[in-house]
Amino acid sequence: MSTGSLSDVEDLQEVEMLECDGLKMDSNKEFVTSNESTEESSNCENGSPQKGRGGLGKRRKAPTKKSPLSGVSQEGKQVQRNAANARERARMRVLSKAFSRLKTTLPWVPPDTKLSKLDTLRLASSYIAHLRQILANDKYENGYIHPVNLTWPFMVAGKPESDLKEVVTASRLCGTTAS
């Protein structure tokens, strides 16, 4: 990997000199002897590397190949990748099960209906809004406060405390303890 330092230039010059001596670098970044008498050997006799095609006078850069990762680090990366893939599959499995449970709880959706996740969420949201509306219309009927209408710490949502006290006393009077 090139860092742009002086040692990179020196390494490149060393490679060129070794190529002139009949050694070539193979794909594993190891030098091997060349039995062929090619253009490199003729260039070495001239004392300069081959110029670009057409005599433009520009020297081509040798393609730099990344050194292969050691077997240990490749195995470690593969293990990490497999673990991450397994975690993602488990997460998606849990998410899919949650969406299928949500779809089956919606009352007006037939079980064989295919719904996208977005459609499932939209239907669930509209169902929740529908239930809220029913509870809002039926909030104080018969002096009974539905637990959904209670907020922490058990106050009727949207009602002043004075109205709450009236509802609580009315529910006590209407309960089974009144005689």
Swiss-Prot record:
Which keywords has UniProt assigned to this entry? DNA-binding, Nucleus, Transcription, Transcription regulation
Region span, Disordered = 20-87
- Cellular location of this protein? Nucleus
Where does the secretion signal sit in this chain? Answer: none
Q: Which GO terms describe its cellular component?
A: chromatin; nucleoplasm; nucleus; transcription regulator complex
- UniProt-listed SUPFAM superfamilies: HLH, helix-loop-helix DNA-binding domain
Alphabetized GO MF terms: bHLH transcription factor binding; DNA-binding transcription activator activity, RNA polymerase II-specific; DNA-binding transcription factor activity, RNA polymerase II-specific; DNA-binding transcription repressor activity, RNA polymerase II-specific; E-box binding; histone deacetylase binding; nuclear androgen receptor binding; protein dimerization activity
The UniProt entry, under InterPro entries, shows:
bHLH_dom (IPR011598), E-box_TF_Regulators (IPR050283), HLH_DNA-bd_sf (IPR036638)
Give the matching SMART domains.
HLH
Identify the Gene3D superfamilies for this entry.
Answer: Helix-loop-helix DNA-binding domain
Q: Which domain of life is it from?
A: Eukaryota
PROSITE patterns cross-referenced by the UniProt entry: BHLH (PS50888)
Q: Where is the composition biased (Low complexity)?
A: 33-46
Annotated coiled-coil positions are none
* Residues annotated as transmembrane: none
Q: Kindly list the biological process annotations in GO that this record carries.
A: branching involved in ureteric bud morphogenesis; branchiomeric skeletal muscle development; bronchiole development; developmental process; diaphragm development; embryonic digestive tract morphogenesis; epithelial cell differentiation; gland development
Q: What is its main location?
A: nucleus
- Where is the bHLH domain positioned along the sequence? 79-131
Role this protein plays: Involved in epithelial-mesenchymal interactions in kidney and lung morphogenesis that include epithelial differentiation and branching morphogenesis. May play a role in the specification or differentiation of one or more subsets of epicardial cell types.
Subunit structure, as described in the record? Efficient DNA binding requires dimerization with another bHLH protein. Forms a heterodimer with TCF3 and binds the E box (5'-CANNTG-3').
Q: What name is this protein filed under?
A: Transcription factor 21
Organism lineage reads as: Eukaryota, Metazoa, Chordata, Craniata, Vertebrata
